[in-house]
Amino acid sequence: MAKRPGSPGSREMGLLTFRDVVIEFSLEEWQCLDHAQQNLYRDVMLENYRNLVSLGIAVSKPDLITCLEQNKEPWNIKRNEMVTKHPVMCSHFTQDLPPELGIKDSLQKVIPRRYGKSGHDNLQVKTCKSMGECEVQKGGCNEVNQCLSTTQNKIFQTHKCVKVFGKFSNSNRHKTRHTGKKHFKCKKYGKSFCMVSQLHQHQIIHTRENSYQCEECGKPFNCSSTLSKHKRIHTGEKPYRCEECGKAFTWSSTLTKHRRIHTGEKPYTCEECGQAFSRSSTLANHKRIHTGEKPYTCEECGKAFSLSSSLTYHKRIHTGEKPYTCEECGKAFNCSSTLKKHKIIHTGEKPYKCKECGKAFAFSSTLNTHKRIHTGEEPYKCEECDKAFKWSSSLANHKSMHTGEKPYKCE
C-alpha cells in the first residue's frame, strides 16, 4: 500500500519547524508598522510558537520568541552572523554551537533528538555561500561530523552559513533567504514574500481583520489582545509602573521609552551627523533636517512642513482655533509653548539669567538679545550703508534716514 504525501513515513514531508511559520522584519519594515500592527505581529508569532509546542513538536525557545515576550523590538535580533570567536548558530535546531566545544559532539546530541526516526542517511549538510550555489554532502553521521569539522575553521573566517537540513525542500527554502527573491505575492495588498509560509501567515491577518469590536467606542481590532489593551484608554488603567519615579503607563512600550529618561540611553544614532536619540521616531524626524524632506503639506495654502505637529499648529492660522487658554486672564493661544511664555507675565518668573552680570529675564530670546551688550555683536546690517546694529528695532529706525520716511506724526 502506497504512502500518501504527508504521512509520517514520507521522507519528502519533513518536520514542521518554527522557521516555517515565522515572519521576519527589517528595521525599515518594522518602523512602517503602526502600534496595532506591531502588537498583532507579536500576538500571531507567540500563538504560532504555542501551537507548535501544543502539537508535541519539541522545539527549544527561539530568540525571537524570548524577545517578543519581553516586549523588545524583534529586528534587534541578528541571525546567521558567523564571525571569529562567536558561536555558530544552527537556526534550524535553534541551538548554539560554541567553537571551543567542537561541532561534532553537539551534532551527535542534536540530530538523534531532532531527526531520530528518519535516520542520519537522510541528512544533508549544506555550506551556503551567500547569493551563490550550495555544496551538498549526503551520508551518515560520520560524514556529517567530518564535513562540519573540516569546514569549522572556514566558518569563522568567511561569511558562509552552515545549516543542516532533513530534506531537500528545506534547503531550497533556506537559499531564498540569501537571494532575497520574493515569488509569493499577496493579491490584496501587493506585498511580496520569499516563502509561501510567510504569505500564508500574512493572509491570516486579513482573515482576522476587524473581528473584535470595542463595546465602548465601536472601534474594530484584528485580535482580542489588542482590544484588551485598547480598553485601557476607556478604563484609565495603567498597569506598567516605573520603579525609578513611580510614574505609571498604559503600554509597556511607553514605559520602555520612559526609562531612557533615567538611564540616559540613546540607542538611535543619526548616520549623517552622529547625534543620538532615545526614540526611533525622533531620529526619523531629525533625518529630515539632512534630507530637506517636508512630507506634510497644508491643503489651504500649500506650505510644507517636516513635522506633522508643525502642520497642526500652522492650520490654526487658517481656522483661527486657539485651544490653549490662560486660567488667569482668559486669553487664548494657538500654541501651548506660547501659553507657557504668557503665564510668566502672571507669575513674574524670570528663569533665564545672564552669567556675565546676573540680570534675569522672563524669556530666553530676551536674554540672547541682552548678551549683545557684553559681546558687542551687531547682527543687523544696513544694506544701504553697511552700518551694523545690535537690535532689529535700531536698524528699522536707521533705515528711515535713507528713505526719508517719517512714520511718527504729532496729533
Swiss-Prot record:
CDD domains documented for this protein: KRAB_A-box (cd07765)
Gene Ontology molecular-function annotations: DNA-binding transcription factor activity, RNA polymerase II-specific; RNA polymerase II cis-regulatory region sequence-specific DNA binding; zinc ion binding
Domain KRAB residue range list: 16-87
ZnF (C2H2-type) residues: 156-178, 184-206, 212-234, 240-262, 268-290, 296-318, 324-346, 352-374, 380-402
A GO CC term assigned to this protein in UniProt: nucleus
Alphabetized Pfam families for the sequence: KRAB (PF01352), zf-C2H2 (PF00096), zf-C2H2_4 (PF13894)
PROSITE patterns membership: KRAB (PS50805), ZINC_FINGER_C2H2_1 (PS00028), ZINC_FINGER_C2H2_2 (PS50157)
Entry-linked InterPro entries: KRAB, KRAB_dom_sf, Snail/Krueppel_Znf, Znf_C2H2_sf, Znf_C2H2_type
Record bears the keyword Zinc: yes
General function of this protein: May be involved in transcriptional regulation.
Similarity section: Belongs to the krueppel C2H2-type zinc-finger protein family.
Entry protein name: Zinc finger protein 679
Organism the protein comes from: Homo sapiens (Human)
Upper taxonomic lineage: Eukaryota, Metazoa, Chordata, Craniata, Vertebrata
